[in-house]
Amino acid sequence: MSDPSSSDPFDVVVIGGGPGGYVAAIRAAQLGLKTALIEGRGSLGGTCLNIGCIPSKALLHASEHVAQAHHSFADWGIRLGKISVDLAQMMTKKDEVVEGLTSGIELL
């Protein structure tokens, strides 16, 4: 994708770096069009990837681990002490998941 600060006109300007936007921009560039992608969020992937579905599912996954530690492990004879949740670490891991996926899109 081209540098939007250039004074040369673009053939295609795509607004929004969600799943439709970045795919459209990639395809336009593959077809030889001078393409700009405008994304206000600062990272590609759209709402689902950055603040919606994926972060929510990452936190849900963490909560499932907590539930297993509290309930399912004992069924298998695994006894743990008091289980505690480090919310700050859960949020850090969630951010790492999102960052990994958004950085993967940027490599396209």
Language-model regions, residue ranges each:
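Glycine-rich Rossmann-fold phosphate-binding loop(s) that bind the pyrophosphate
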Residues: 16-19, 42
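Glycine-rich flavin
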Residues: 2-4, 9, 27-33, 39-108
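Short glycine/serine/threonine-rich phosphate/pyrophosphate-binding segments
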Residues: 20-24
